[in-house]
Design a protein with these regions (language model features):
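Active-site glycine-rich loop that binds ribose-phosphate moieties when present
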Residues: 118-125, 141-145
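Alpha-helix-loop-beta-strand connector modules within alpha/beta enzyme cores
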Residues: 16-36, 95-102, 268-275
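Flexible, glycine-rich active-site loops centered on histidine and acidic residues
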Residues: 43-113, 165-166, 172
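Aromatic/hydrophobic pocket-lining residues that form the small-molecule binding cavity
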Residues: 19, 23, 50, 92-96, ...
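Single conserved hydrophobic/aromatic residue that forms the stacking wall/gate
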Residues: 1-15
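Short, well-ordered coil/turn segments that N-cap beta-strands
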Residues: 30-35, 60-65, 108-112, 130-136, ...
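C-terminal amphipathic alpha-helical "assembly" element
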Residues: 58, 66-68, 77, 87-88, ...
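Active-site mouth loops of central-metabolism enzymes
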Residues: 40-47, 132-142, 196, 224-235
């Protein structure tokens, strides 16, 4: 059954449940599909604990977890989250990258000694991930530094936009960075999209604006400069998605705003048309 049918569950886009805990539950009920975070903020986590949580989730899902990570957009709600966690917002890039390196060290199963932001002495993680070395890590972000970082260090690139043409140009930069690092072809191209499908385009547009402002605590017009959104009729939706596929995206993640049941049927048709 869907969350809508059960009626005592929330859609993941409606509330911010604990990501890895929620995915562990989904992994136990859904045996085939890939699962991922969009995106997890490693800078907010202790990497020793994060490495253990992710390894456990990868075991529960039998290797179906994709670890989407990011440094977080500079918006009021996210700054407030960092402040509440006692983590300096301006240090988030360094914390993320070092934290991920420490996670990967633990995922080898070998004893770990670490002397950096975190101190670790002769420690071993158990269980290790289902996949040797850990799950694939996809990096979000569209800034120039994020593109280079994805090409040099990550297994996938996972931004929230911009439009298909802009995504294609940025994807070229990611691929060039990967090639320069000796990693040609090692990065998966993905994109995270927000959609509201309705014959009344103005209504759909307003729903997206309301959702974004509530979620991020910032005017929608600012958020939409860096996040790709579709608001309009079904007939225009698949061609819009196809623009990203033609630009090189192999994975399309869709955040739905509006009636989820009707959107699921439309997404299924779009998937079949694009395959």
């Amino acid at each position: 059954k869907t969350a809508y049918e059960i009626r005592n569950c929330d859609w993941s886009s409606d509330v911010c449940s604990s990501d890895l805990t929620l995915l562990a539950g989904v992994a136990g009920r859904v045996p085939r599909v890939e699962l991922g975070t969009a995106v997890l903020l490693p800078a907010l986590r202790n990497p020793v604990i994060l490495a253990h949580l992710v390894a456990t989730l990868d075991q529960v899902s039998e290797g179906r977890f994709i670890m989407g990570v990011g440094i977080a957009a500079d918006v009021p709600n996210i700054r407030a989250e960092f402040e509440a966690a006692g983590v300096p917002f301006e240090k988030r890039v360094g914390r993320m990258m070092e934290g991920l390196r420490l996670c990967k060290a633990f995922w080898t199963g070998d004893p770990v000694n670490w002397d950096g932001r975190w101190k670790v002495e002769d420690s071993v993680l158990g269980p290790t991930p289902h996949r040797p070395g850990g799950p694939p890590i996809w990096g979000g972000g569209s800034a120039e530094a994020s593109l280079t970082r994805a090409g040099k260090h990550f297994d996938g690139w996972f931004p929230t936009g911009p439009d298909a043409a802009g995504w294609g140009k940025q994807w070229k930069t990611v691929c060039e960075a990967a090639e320069a690092a000796g990693r040609a072809g090692a990065v998966t191209g993905a994109v995270y999209l927000t959609v509201s499908i309705d014959d009344d385009a103005a209504k759909a547009d307003g729903m997206i604006n309301d959702y974004l402002e509530n979620y991020y605590g910032q005017p929608a017009e600012i958020i939409r400069r860096r996040q790709a959104c579709f608001a309009g009729p079904e007939a225009e939706f698949t061609p819009w998605l196809k623009g990203y596929v033609d630009a090189g995206a192999s994975h399309l993640m869709v955040r739905v705003v509006g009636d989820h049941e009707s959107h699921i049927a439309i997404l299924a048709k779009a998937r079949d048309a694009l395959n």
